Regions:
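Amphipathic alpha-helical segments of tetratricopeptide repeats
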Residues: 27-32, 67-75, 109-119
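"A position-specific structural signal for the A-helix of alpha-solenoid helical repeats
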Residues: 8, 41, 48, 82, ...
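Residue register of alpha-helical TPR repeats
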Residues: 4, 24, 44, 85, ...
């Protein structure tokens, strides 16, 4: 299946609540895009795989994939919103793994990028998540 076909199937799985299937399909899409040397699309698909792994309860897998995406973006700076979204997924994975200090740092960094990109919902989510983490510290 092509990367594009995998993305279409992953979106369908996500809408149906089949998060583990969505994760696997996004991973397959990422592999396809990487093989085609479409690195921006690879990172984007892998970020989605990471998020759905976390949502499906597999925080180690989500964290591992999110770290790969953030490391790639730090070496090849993407558009601001792509980096903000990658940091958001990284922070979600860290929260799920109990790595709250790292999660706070990544939420703060994502917040600044969302602010710069003019994404008010991203700023609000980051503020809310940092407040929750501060309350449990």
């Amino acid at each position: 299946m092509s990367g594009d076909d995998c993305v279409i199937e992953a979106k369908s799985a996500r809408r149906q609540g089949r998060l583990s299937d969505a994760t696997a399909l996004y991973e397959e899409a990422a592999e396809s895009f990487q093989a085609e040397n479409q690195l921006a699309r690879w990172a984007h698909a892998l970020r989605h795989a990471a998020e759905f792994a976390v949502r499906a309860g597999d925080s180690p897998r989500g964290l591992r994939e999110a770290q790969i995406v953030v490391e790639y973006y730090r070496s090849s700076p993407p558009p601001t919103l792509e980096m903000a979204n990658a940091l958001r997924v990284m922070a979600l994975a860290e929260m799920a793994a109990g790595e709250n200090d790292s999660a706070v740092s990544h939420w703060i960094e994502a917040r600044e990028l969302y602010l710069h990109a003019g994404v008010a919902d991203g700023v609000l989510e980051a503020d809310r998540r940092v407040a929750v983490l501060a309350a449990v510290a």
